[in-house]
């Protein structure tokens, strides 16, 4: 499945696209791909890490940071629950979801691949993606 990293800003923010993030204070959830991307693109000094998404959004609402970079689906919920926030139209990054298995563990790999094949063939995988991820299964 595909995921999208989006940017949440306050209404009236001067941030209109990812191009405007240079020099800004960017909130991220610690250890996420948004954290990795933003730290790599803008440096640790511009990235403020939070233990979870709601804490990052609260910091944005309180004016402690300029924006939040986070997965699209939770971002929609955070914006719906906090008036005065919006998601920018331009995504920060697109990414693929994946399952990691220790190299050489063919027994587990075969079981996971078999289960995914079954779930794909009977439509269960697409139903899960549609309900919880809201993206196209790949």
What residues fall within each predicted segment?
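Residue-level signal for nonpolar/aromatic packing positions in well-ordered secondary structure
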Residues: 7, 21, 38, 60, ...
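Ligand-binding cleft/hinge of the Venus flytrap
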Residues: 34-51, 79-80, 134
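Flexible hinge/capping segments at coil-to-helix
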Residues: 9-26
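Short helix-initiation/N-cap motifs at beta->coil->alpha
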Residues: 13-14, 30-33, 48-62, 95
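Periplasmic-binding protein-like
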Residues: 1-9, 34, 38, 72, 76-138
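Short, Asp-centered acidic motifs that coordinate Mg2+ and/or phosphate
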Residues: 25, 66-67, 86, 98
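Short helices/loops that flank or line small-molecule/ion binding pockets
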Residues: 19-22, 40-41, 54-69, 73, ...
């Amino acid at each position: 499945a595909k995921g999208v990293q989006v940017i949440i800003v306050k209404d009236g923010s001067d941030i209109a696209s990812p191009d405007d993030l240079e020099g800004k204070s960017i909130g991220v959830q610690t250890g996420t791909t948004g954290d990795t991307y933003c730290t790599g693109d803008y440096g640790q000094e511009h990235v403020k890490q939070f233990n979870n998404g709601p804490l990052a959004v609260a910091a944005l609402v309180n004016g402690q940071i300029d924006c939040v970079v986070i997965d699209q689906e939770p971002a929609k919920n955070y914006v719906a629950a906090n008036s005065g926030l919006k998601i920018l139209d331009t995504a920060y990054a697109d990414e693929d979801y994946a399952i990691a298995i220790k190299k050489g563990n063919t027994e587990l790999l075969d079981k996971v691949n078999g289960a995914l094949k079954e779930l794909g063939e009977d439509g269960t995988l697409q139903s899960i993606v549609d309900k919880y991820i809201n993206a196209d299964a790949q």
